[in-house]
Swiss-Prot record:
Domain of life, source organism: Bacteria
Descriptive protein name: Translation initiation factor IF-2
Entry's family note: Belongs to the TRAFAC class translation factor GTPase superfamily. Classic translation factor GTPase family. IF-2 subfamily.
PROSITE patterns noted in UniProt: G_TR_2 (PS51722), IF2 (PS01176)
Region of interest: G1: 407-414
Region (G4): 507-510
Major subcellular location class: cytoplasm
Annotated keywords: Cytoplasm, GTP-binding, Initiation factor, Nucleotide-binding, Protein biosynthesis
Region entry G2, spans: 432-436
Domain tr-type G per the UniProt entry, residue ranges: 398-567
PANTHER family documented for this protein: TR-TYPE G DOMAIN-CONTAINING PROTEIN, TRANSLATION INITIATION FACTOR IF-2-RELATED
UniProt-recorded Gene Ontology molecular function terms: GTP binding; GTPase activity; translation initiation factor activity
Amino acid sequence: MAETTVKKLADIVGTPVEKLLTQMKDAGLPHGDASEVVSDEQKQQLLAHLRKSHGAEDEGSGKKITLKRKSTSTIKTTGAAGKSKTVNVEVRKKRTYMKRDVVEAEEREEAERLAAEEAARIAEEEKRAAQEAAKRAADDEAARLKEDEARAKAEQERKAAGEKAAEEKSKRVSVPKVSATKKPAKEETPEEKAKREEAERKQREADEAKRKQEAEARKKAEEEAARRTAEEAARIAAELEQRGEQEEKKPAVEDDKGSSIVNAAQEASYQREERQSRRRRRKPKVAGVVHGKMKSSMNKQHGFKTPTEKKIYEVEVPETITVGDLAQRMNIKAKSLIKSLMKMGEMATVNQPIDQETAFLLVEEMGHKPVASKGQEELLEDHLAADLVTRDSVDSEHRAPVVTIMGHVDHGKTSLLDYIRKAKVASGEAGGITQHIGAYHVEHEKGMITFLDTPGHAAFTAMRARGAKATDIVVIVVAADDGVMPQTEEAINHAKASGAPIIIAVNKIDKEQADPDRVRNELATKDVIPEEWGGEYQFINVSAHSGEGVDDLLDAILLQSELLELQAQASGSATGVVIESRIEKGRGTVASILVQGGELQIGDMLLAGAHFGRVRAMVDENGKAIKKAGPSIPVEVLGLNGAPEAGEQIQVVTDERKAREVAEFRQERDRELKLKRQQASKLENLFENMGSAETKTVNIVLKTDVRGSLEALTSALNDLGTDEVKVNLVSSGVGAINESDVNLAMTSEGVLLGFNVRADSKAKRVCEQEGIDLRYYSVIYELIDDVKQAMSGLLAPEKREEILGVAQVRDVFRSSKFGAVAGCMVVEGTLYRNRPIRVLRDDVVVFEGELESLRRFKDDVPEVRNGMECGIAVKSYNDVKEGDKIEVFEVKEVARFL
């Protein structure tokens, strides 16, 4: 046999020589050159190493080998143009070899296992059959003994009754002569009675011994059958093992033989059991005769007894439940439950949800016991709370204070924050006003401070309330030249409601009109007393323009935070609050989050209200990417599946499935609440509009840049509605205006409004084609004013009466053509012919109509001025008297405005 070198082995295997040498070196072989010889043992060692490195087991080496062969040849073919070309042909072959003893051993082991299982099953079947037969025999014996005892007792009672009857008869017949000839009845002597009882006892003992012998014989037969079955199974297994070494072609023959033996034994056992049960089968025995009718000894075990008492259930009632589910829990039909609801004055369908209180009343009405239970959402919320408890076990550390800047619009909140941050932010806000919460953290020489800048406009009340809720310290900015304004009072109320400490920053003290004492006096009337006056509020004079007093303000903030002793967990699952959220093209949902505890990292599963998602990226307020954020750090998070509401609590959960379930339940809950509100408003509107004219509506499709602005605009627009004109928000959302928004506006005949967003190319094209009114806004004042103007256009005009002139009747003439004609003097204004008139008598209106004729002398004139005489004929009125006044007026329609 030719020797195999490393190079030849590489050609056979199809591997480069360098790679094969590396693998041989890893396997511990001494080969370093391609010309060295490789033995069979070394090949096996290399193969075992490769199998082990690729995940195969060591014990499998040597049992199975796969060989590949590749040969390359060339053939010449003629193409379509008659030219010949050479084609390379590559033939690949693959064969797998296994040792025969491995296959035989596996087949032998499988056959032995099957035979043992079959034998065990047969033994179990025979044992169970023997036990059942013994049980049936014992039952038959007990029934027989009971029957014998009953028969003997009945016989004794019959004899006793006969003896008693004979004795009474003998007493009644008392003839002395005849009694000498009569033979007395033969009575059983005590000796005979004792002999009879002894014979019966011996018979019972013999029967008992016989029954015990039969039971022992059955037990021995059962053990013998099990032993024979085990011996047969062992014999079959040994025979299979002996034949497995010789037989190679059909290993299944032993299996067939073994299974046939087992099947035959099993069939014989079944036939024997069937014969025994057939012999023991008896007809129902007669227990006695009652009034000439036979009474069966069989018990009526399957007799149905009608329930006489009503079953009372304990019905678990969650917070909301549908009528159908409640009926199913009480085991009644839904129709009866709907009838009970109608009696209570509430109309409902089978699938309509009802609240827990109504369900309690219904359950008590139906006679059952209601029990309050937690819904699935509450259970999930409890699991999340348990996760928070485990996180709270981490030691707390000192954290930076969260400071909210609040105050009236244009009082310099953002400018003050700009000076602290040394950046210009207010210039980027439209109209120079802040329209959503900005979050920033500032590194001061004495510590870090996180600032929240809230809008000062009245429409952002809810946003300011959220800012006060998430804060530790509130800084209220008041302009020294403007004093306390409405939003200043509102900010003070929000801060007091949240319980956060308040610091008053009196801004713009560098102006000539500045009067800090006036601010102190005005705030003192609002129960905000300065410290220097004996109160508890710090007043700091600052100037956002020159920077005067800014350091004092920061020192006051840090001093107040030290008094509060703010603590938070620096590690563990993060919790916080959503400051703002928006949808950006190319980035998706972007949520501004203030971390309040724990550590938020990239890759965490975040649950925010009814939305969830994995954190894909985080950036700080400067746009710089970060990987983690600790307590009191504001960040922007990417990865949520939707834009959450501002103010929603966020929490990091470990399980994505749990986060999805909680988010879906919260969405379903919000949808049900929304439907309930809509249904209630529809019913209210139905009764309000009954008998009145139809209310006009302004349909609006609104898109904004962030959630906070959307909420503020929605609240402001809903407040604009009146009894005559209402605002109907057909759709509202966050993000750019797309084609579906345009189609919605076109269908509802509404106006499309964009606040700090723009429409894409498709939406613009559809707007131009269909003539949809599309408007862009960057300041909230302008949007609200335009909507007011549109609503004013739908208002019915106001009708106003204007008196044009008054004439006094001096005399009354009769005319064949007009009847009574009043000769009048114009005492006020001008009289016009084609105008409505009123006839006043003693300054009381007695007639209202129109002029039929207006003449001066004998000429018809269109008008008569003040101080002139004229003749007036009133149409359809002839009761004009001297001294009356004729008033000419005009009705004008005046446009109304909200």
